Amino acid sequence: DYSCANGFCPSFVTVVGGQLKKPSAGIDSGTADKVETLFDPLPEPTLPTLDRPWNTVVTGVGGTGVLTVTALVAMAAHVEGKGCATMNQTGLAQKFGAVVSHVRVGRDQEDIRAVRIPAGEADLLLGADLVVTTTYEAMGKVARGRTHAVVNEAEVPTAAFILDPDARFPTAAMKDRVETEVGSDGCHFIDATHIATALLGDSIASN
C-alpha cells in the first residue's frame, strides 16, 4: 500500500532521477582475483542421496534478501519434485535485525517430520552476516564433521558503534568461533559485500 514510502517507515526515502553509483576505477586487482576464482568452472557436485533431509541454515539481517534465498531454495526443491519445509525466524527484523532461516529438503514431503532443524543437524550454514552467524541460534545447529559453512566476512556495523564510535569489530574472534564449531576444513569465508558492490554498485546483491 506504499505506506512506508508515504512516511510510515522512517527508514524509507524516495530518490527521484537517481542512479546506482558504480566505482569509477573499476574492480581492483584483489577483487578481480577473488571474482575470477569464484567463477572458475566448477565440477558437478556430488548430490546427497536424501536418505535423510538435507538441512540448511541461512543467517543474515532483515531487508537484505535472506528470505528470498530461502524461497529460491524451496522453489527449486518443489520444481524437482522433492519435499521441502522452511521456517523464518525474523522477529522484528524488518530492517537490519537478525534473521535465521531453516530450509529442509527431503526426497518426499513425508520424509520431513518437523520444520525446525534439530541441534547439530545442519548440513550447510549460509552466513550472509558474520554477527548473526555466530549467535547461539545458528551455532547450535552446526556440528563438526557434518556442517559446511560459507560465510560473508564483511564487517557490518552494529548498534554498538552508535554508542561507542571507537568500538572495534571482532571479526577475527567471530571467524574463530565459526571455525571452532564447524572445523576449519568445513569453513569458507568470502567478502561477498565488497565483490557485489564492485561488480554491481550495490551491496544488496551480495546475498
Question: Which role does the model predict for each range below?
Answer:
Residues A5, P10-N207:
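Active-site cofactor/cluster-binding pocket
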